[in-house]
Every structure is written in C-alpha cells, then in structure tokens.
C-alpha cells in the first residue's frame, strides 16, 4: 500500500530540488557590456583623453587642477548610475607612483596596449590600472570596495578598453 505513495513523493521532492540548481552561477563569462553612447573628451596641456561612456553610466570631466593627483592631471570620473558616489578616475598625470606594501601587479591588455593592474592586500578587485606604451601616463584609479565594483568590474574594463590618448603636438 505504501509503494504507490512513494513515487509521487519522490517526484515532488525532485521537483522541489530542481529550482535550487537553477540559481546564478559565477563563471568566467564576462557580463554583457552596455553599448557606448557618448564619448567623454577632456584636454590638457599634455594632450586629449577620450573614453566611451555606456548608456546608464555617468561621468564628470575634470580639467587640469581639479584632481588631487597633481596640478597638471586632468581626466574623467566615471561611475554606473547606482546611487553610489564612488567612481573610477581615469586621468593623465605627469607622475604616478603607489605604495608597494601589499601590492600585487598583473599585466593586462587594454586599448591596444599593455596596462599594469594593481591589487592590494589580496583583493580580487584592482585599485589602479597604469597604461603603458602609446597610452603611457594614463591611469585609472578606483575604490575596489565600492558596492557596485565587484558586480560591474568587467563593464569597467570594457569602458577602459575604449581609451584613446592623443598627445599634444
């Protein structure tokens, strides 16, 4: 008598466990990058910096003297429209240096050239990217603990891959 009830009970248990296997998985697959809709352009004595800002993201142009990095630094602050005041500062500077304590660096290819990504104290998220080669002098600085950074880090890299640097003649 108990056998006819066992099959429906097993099927019901299986159906209840099935949705548990359908959750979001974190894989190495990149997130879909928003389509760039606007080019942010800022110029200074050293040249012109351009970057594509995706739809749904905000930016602020920062002329020379408006960043705390140096009087000559100029660039663009970029952030997703997430309600956070934390941003990525993308800028040109005549000098760039960081503290080496707890720093691990990895080499990336961005905007057709090499960039050095700096990770502090075992963080999975980078704190800075320093462009080399044709884009030397361009730096991206971020707060790796910003609430949106971990979820949208791939999108940030896609944005930073659109950097164009035109040195002054």
Each model region followed by its residue ranges:
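N-terminal low-complexity, Pro/Thr/Ser-rich intrinsically disordered segments
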Residues: 28-49
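Bacterial signal peptide processing site
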Residues: 23-25
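Bacterial N-terminal signal peptides that target proteins for export
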Residues: 1-10
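Secretory pathway targeting signatures of secreted, lumenal, and periplasmic proteins
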Residues: 43-97, 120-129
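Signature of long, low-cysteine stretches enriched in small and polar/charged residues
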Residues: 95-151, 157, 168-169
